[in-house]
A protein has these predicted regions:
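Membrane-embedded alpha-helices and immediately adjacent juxtamembrane helical segments
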Residues: 1-303
Length: 303
């Protein structure tokens, strides 16, 4: 009941003052050094994503055909890193071919590096939702174990997506006869594969908004944030694809570093949209509670 009252109050304010709410979100994002936080998240995501994918593929290859795993990985990495999924998948495939060389020390080191992005993301969320941290802090053991639990959940998600995607691909090879005309299901299969990826994006973003901030966030708030961030990213992704395929000369400027630069740039934009969505949710909570607008700049304690 209390959440509904807060939601009604926030919705009424936003409908009455949409521009003021938008400006307040932008001010809060700037005061919290949102772009700086996004840069940190993107940098550690770049360090984490390759070892994480390698570990996931090696683990799941015991249950699912590795070739099918790599095809699914390449398709849905394209949603995260436009134009660069092939090179990342090639590195993962090369690691998979040499998986017998993996030792416990190497596996543990890769697992440790894979957790960096989630740890930094949790810290960034604590800056955005500073009003929650001031009330309740998360136990350090929970913070330490959270990245690994989240990686396990993502690994299970990759397995489920691979199974469903494989089923849809098989369906795409079939056809139906309707009113004497044969209709191929290839187009339907392609559309469903894209929607599966979009639904996965929304689910992952929603889970981040639910899990990473301290305290319990309303599911409806997290879902709205997840849908908004996913749709904004889809728009940004199409712009990136168009830019890199028509206007960009990044390969001329950076040469062999092109892949890393493009991936970093894509992750930077994605992290910015992710944290901006979190700022929208934080501002929505503030408006719902009827608190005055306060966005003091983020500062650090003196040495």
């Amino acid at each position: 009941m209390r959440v509904r009252i807060l939601n009604r109050r926030a919705n009424a304010y936003i409908l009455k003052h949409p521009l003021a709410f938008t400006l307040s979100v932008l001010k809060g994002f700037r005061a919290n050094q949102g772009l700086l936080l996004a840069g940190a998240v993107a940098y550690y995501a770049l360090l984490s994503i390759v070892p994480f994918l390698m570990l996931v593929v090696v683990a799941l290859s015991h249950f699912i055909d590795p070739a099918e795993l790599l095809v699914t990985l390449r398709r849905y990495l394209e949603l995260l890193m436009p134009g660069q999924s092939a090179s990342i998948t090639a590195e993962v495939a090369n690691f998979l071919d040499n998986r017998e060389l993996i030792t416990w020390v190497l596996g543990g080191t890769m697992l440790f590096f894979s957790s960096f992005a989630f740890t930094v993301l949790e810290n960034a969320m604590s800056v955005i939702f500073v009003h929650r941290v001031a009330i309740r802090r998360r136990h350090f053991l929970v913070s330490a174990l959270l990245p690994y639990c989240y990686m396990l959940a993502l690994g299970i998600g990759v397995m489920l997506v691979t199974v469903v995607a494989g089923t849809l691909q098989v369906m795409g090879k079939e056809s139906v006869i309707l009113l004497g005309t044969t209709w191929s299901l290839g187009g339907v299969s392609g559309a469903l594969l894209y929607l599966l990826g979009l639904a996965g994006e929304i689910l992952v973003l929603t889970s981040i908004y639910l899990v990473m901030p301290v305290g319990r966030l309303s599911t409806s708030h997290a879902l709205v944030g997840g849908v908004t961030a996913a749709l904004l990213w889809e728009a940004a992704r199409h712009v990136l694809v168009w830019y890199f395929s028509t206007l960009s000369q990044v390969n001329v400027v950076y040469g062999s570093m092109t892949t890393a630069i493009v991936v970093m740039f894509s992750l930077e934009i994605g992290a910015t949209l992710l944290l901006f969505g979190a700022q929208v949710i934080a501002e929505y909570e503030r408006v719902g509670r009827g608190k005055p607008e306060r966005h003091p700049p983020m500062t650090t304690a003196p040495a």
